[in-house]
Amino acid sequence: MIKVEHTNKTFSGKYGEVHALQDVSIHVEKGDIYGIIGFSGAGKSTLLRLVNGLETPDSGTVMVHDQDLGSLKKAELRKLRRKIGMVFQQFNLLDSKTVFHNIALPLILEKAPKDVIEEKVNEVLRFVELEDKKDTYVSQLSGGQKQRVGIARALTTTPDILLCDEATSALDPQTTESILKLLKKINKEMGVTILLITHQMQVVQMICNKVAVMENGKVVESGSVLDVFGKPQALVTKRFVEVSCMGGKA
């Protein structure tokens, strides 16, 4: 479903070049909940942007649904990205608009018929259990409710891939657990493949079946969650395990 092969990405910064990705490869299969974990600056967000077609690698390939993103025309890329939902850390919602309007926005931009918009928004509102907040302004919601709105918005185009960028890092532990349960429900009941990035080992342990550990732009370890965290090889992986055992957040 998602194949990233030997990708490299370098950015030019104020203090010289930053090697954001160095020979990075990951394989995400249909039905996976695949976690990318690493500390700040590890390259996680850059990798996610490659998968979403927002960045192009300097070398290597990014395949989604057996299509090389680098070879697609703009119209083809837009069509493919319609099947990729995105959930953000800071929600990226319009506070001055209602829950309904925020969720409907992707369909409004596509100029979908009003009855189609109404039906789809109500459907995803039921799924994320926010039916009673339909006409509420986003500014009046809690952090957890805002993230549910963000998830519902991502589901309006019926994606088969969901990319989550630190989707729970701004939430308290109890709310984090409820959002992770929702993501697991989306994976199980809708058959959506999920690729998430995080710096919290507990998030990966709770819902992921596979994980890749990143450090300094490289994947230093990958495999099943049980194998990687049960028998950590890389120093950074061992550090995550140690922090988790102490009950803290990496």
Language-model regions, residue ranges each:
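Helix-to-loop junction immediately C-terminal to a conserved catalytic motif
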Residues: N52
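Conserved ABC ATPase "signature" region
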Residues: D68, I108, D115-D132
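Conserved ABC ATPase signature
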Residues: Y137-L141, Q145
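A short, proline-enriched helix->beta-strand linker immediately N-terminal to the Walker B motif
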Residues: T156-D160
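A short, surface-exposed alpha-helical micro-motif characterized by mixed small hydrophobic
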Residues: V204-M206
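ABC ATPase "signature
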Residues: S222-G223
